[in-house]
A protein has these predicted regions:
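Beta-strand/loop-rich accessory regions of lumenal/periplasmic or secreted enzymes
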Residues: 1-192
């Protein structure tokens, strides 16, 4: 999976226009190390709603390890502590082990998502999500809705601090320091 951790991403095209009262921003990225192109489109209306379309086209003949995740990461202020979502819960679950969880509406805190496994690793994921709200104590924040169910997680840890590659600097979860941020992951697909 190493190629996907640093795919050699390079912006190759960027343009924007205003159409039917919406700002439309298009960007194209070359992912040299994995022989792929990534296309992102942001449609922003005058009410503050943003529709994001993400598409990747890979060279079918490229010899690249399987992709472990396809989605987006958003680093938010730590104060975005409150989570509400409609999906599987209340405990963490992944696509290969989510049948022990119930579909429902859950209200949780980011601080409660991290589970201190002996060996540090990503955790706290939720699947089959229809909508996800990430807000601060005043109720201000963002809501994510997709055309198909998605996965999400929010932690006060960076991905790198939980999985820094083949040479782990920390051997136990208690050695990983909590970051002064909320790291939100919204994924279309993830290996579980």
């Amino acid at each position: 999976y190493a190629a996907w951790k640093n795919p050699g991403i390079k912006l190759t095209d960027f343009n924007y226009k205003v159409e039917n009262g919406q700002a439309i921003v298009n960007s194209t990225y070359d992912l040299k190390e994995v022989s792929a192109k990534l296309y992102l489109t942001y449609q922003i209306n005058n009410q503050g709603a943003v529709k994001v379309t993400q598409k990747m086209v890979a060279d079918k003949n490229a010899k690249v390890s399987p992709m472990f995740r396809f989605g987006m990461q958003m680093v938010m202020p730590k104060s975005f502590e409150k989570i509400s979502y409609y999906g599987r819960g209340p405990i963490e679950n992944y696509s290969d082990r989510n049948h022990c969880t119930d579909l429902g509406i859950y209200n949780q805190n980011v601080s409660d998502q991290f589970y201190p496994y002996i060996r540090p690793q990503e955790n706290g994921n939720k699947t089959d999500i229809r909508w996800w709200k990430q807000v601060n104590m005043a109720g201000n924040g963002l809501m994510f809705v997709a055309e198909a169910p998605f996965s999400a997680s929010a932690l006060h840890y960076t991905i790198a601090s939980l999985d820094d590659g083949t040479e782990k600097k920390q051997s136990h979860s208690f050695e990983v320091e909590e970051a002064d941020l909320t790291n939100l992951l919204i994924d279309k697909a993830q290996m579980g």
